[in-house]
Amino acid sequence: MASLGQIIFWSIINVIIILAGAIVLIIGFGISGKHFITVTTFTSAGNIGEDGTLSCTFEPDIKLNGIVIQWLKEGIKGLVHEFKEGKDDLSQQHEMFRGRTAVFADQVVVGNASLRLKNVQLTDAGTYTCYIHTSKGKGNANLEYKTGAFSMPEINVDYNASSESLRCEAPRWFPQPTVAWASQVDQGANFSEVSNTSFELNSENVTMKVVSVLYNVTINNTYSCMIENDIAKATGDIKVTDSEVKRRSQLELLNSGPSPCVSSVSAAGWALLSLSCCLMLR
């Protein structure tokens, strides 16, 4: 049989938990009075000097005038971009983004809140939040945006050298990448001793041109020039035969993927209330 002290102790605990649950419920309903919706962002990378896209999707809503899209950046006061009542509202936009942002207005009703960012800069890197408010509810998700430079490599045969060689060039990379060569015939071979790689700073003093030369190549073989940093990986392939030269290039952005977020404050409140009921039965 429980002592008087134990009864008082559990009574106090029950009251605290019930009050906590009630507060959470009040906050949850007070903030929105609606359900929370799913918002999904996609981690992506921006190429310096070019236009980029910060991807964000949400549950579609045909009531365009009731949709509010806000983009925020960690460490920046003001908004990156705001769209509401069917049009842009840039009255609170931070100056570093002026004239550089736009949403895909004709795709908002189908759930596209992606942000177009013009003339990507190194300083655009960081954590962004895509915040959505519709007639169905509200939600948000974070996005990690990396900035750098990356480009396709081009491989050519250098017939002017004393022995046949391959020259791999890529015009713009940042941060400085690693470069490696591979051969279809000599798989696993280390070509570092028969290749030479250099980096030349471009005129804007940020990005660099990558040049790598592979010596003593043989015909009827396929060689690959691989350039990679923490943002992207590019591969250029070349096949040299007696009669022709075949080339192929591809570029892959690294560490890209979805980041869904579903808020559920109300559920937490009900969980606390359920716990308090269990304790009251003790």
UniProtKB/Swiss-Prot annotation:
Residues 1-24 form the signal peptide. N-glycosylated. It is found in: Cell membrane. One of its GO terms (molecular function) is signaling receptor binding. GO terms for cellular component: external side of plasma membrane. The keyword Heme does not apply. Disulfide bonds join 56-130, 168-225. Its main location: membrane. Glycans are attached at residue 216. GO terms for biological process: adaptive immune response; negative regulation of apoptotic process; negative regulation of T cell activation; negative regulation of T cell proliferation; positive regulation of interleukin-2 production; positive regulation of T cell proliferation; regulation of cytokine production; response to protozoan. It comes from the Eukaryota. PROSITE patterns: IG_LIKE (PS50835). Residues 35-144, 153-241 form the Ig-like V-type domain. Residues 258-282 form a propeptide. InterPro entries: BTN3A2-like_Ig-C, Ig-like_dom, Ig-like_dom_sf, Ig-like_fold, Ig_sub, Ig_V-set, IgSF_BTN/MOG. It is a lipid-anchor; GPI-anchor. A lipid is attached at residue 257 (GPI-anchor amidated glycine). Keywords: Adaptive immunity, Cell membrane, Disulfide bond, Glycoprotein, GPI-anchor, Immunity, Immunoglobulin domain, Lipoprotein, Membrane, Repeat, Signal. Belongs to the immunoglobulin superfamily. BTN/MOG family. This is V-set domain-containing T-cell activation inhibitor 1. It comes from Rattus norvegicus (Rat). The lineage of its organism: Eukaryota, Metazoa, Chordata, Craniata, Vertebrata. The gene is Vtcn1.
